[in-house]
Amino acid sequence: MNLSSLKPAEGAVKSRKRIGRGPGSGLGGTSTRGHKGAKSRSGYSKKIGFEGGQMPIQRRLPKFGFKNINRVEYKPINLSVLQTLSEANSLTKISVEDLIAAGLVSRNSLVKILANGTVTTALTVEAHAFSKTAEEAIVRAGGSVVKL
């Protein structure tokens, strides 16, 4: 046996349909396209979304809202999380890098600090955004806020 003698299994390869080659072929005449009409003619292609004259789905369904391409999404981190993180690692400065290292946020996400929970230690917190109450709570505890 060698590569030049290999053949596909019996019945595995079908011969292609040769249409429009005269009446003797069995596929002449209308060439499997039926009689007349746009679909029988060359160059025919129906419009995308065309449903045979029925009102298409994109016009039947009501239209709601849109996706704002300028939307900025922040990953929320609560003050209680910052407090537990600072206690566990004895940190006084918490940056986005610390949150990434702790597995709380992914590398490319923007971070917003929210005021759920309390902060008892003086922390310097770096983040992309802060809620007003979170900012006040951090400053009240003797810490500071750094917006990136």
From Swiss-Prot:
<dbReference type="InterPro" id="IPR005749">
    <property type="entry name" value="Ribosomal_uL15_bac-type"/>
</dbReference>
<dbReference type="GO" id="GO:0022625">
    <property type="term" value="C:cytosolic large ribosomal subunit"/>
</dbReference>
<keyword id="KW-0687">Ribonucleoprotein</keyword>
<dbReference type="InterPro" id="IPR001196">
    <property type="entry name" value="Ribosomal_uL15_CS"/>
</dbReference>
<keyword id="KW-0699">rRNA-binding</keyword>
<dbReference type="InterPro" id="IPR036227">
    <property type="entry name" value="Ribosomal_uL15/eL18_sf"/>
</dbReference>
<dbReference type="InterPro" id="IPR030878">
    <property type="entry name" value="Ribosomal_uL15"/>
</dbReference>
<dbReference type="GO" id="GO:0019843">
    <property type="term" value="F:rRNA binding"/>
</dbReference>
<dbReference type="GO" id="GO:0003735">
    <property type="term" value="F:structural constituent of ribosome"/>
</dbReference>
<comment type="function">
    <text>Binds to the 23S rRNA.</text>
</comment>
<dbReference type="Pfam" id="PF00828">
    <property type="entry name" value="Ribosomal_L27A"/>
</dbReference>
<feature type="compositionally biased region" description="Gly residues">
    <location>
        <begin position="21"/>
        <end position="31"/>
    </location>
</feature>
<comment type="similarity">
    <text>Belongs to the universal ribosomal protein uL15 family.</text>
</comment>
<keyword id="KW-0694">RNA-binding</keyword>
<dbReference type="GO" id="GO:0006412">
    <property type="term" value="P:translation"/>
</dbReference>
<keyword id="KW-0689">Ribosomal protein</keyword>
<dbReference type="InterPro" id="IPR021131">
    <property type="entry name" value="Ribosomal_uL15/eL18"/>
</dbReference>
<protein>
    <recommendedName>
        <fullName>Large ribosomal subunit protein uL15</fullName>
    </recommendedName>
</protein>
<feature type="region of interest" description="Disordered">
    <location>
        <begin position="1"/>
        <end position="51"/>
    </location>
</feature>
<comment type="subunit">
    <text>Part of the 50S ribosomal subunit.</text>
</comment>
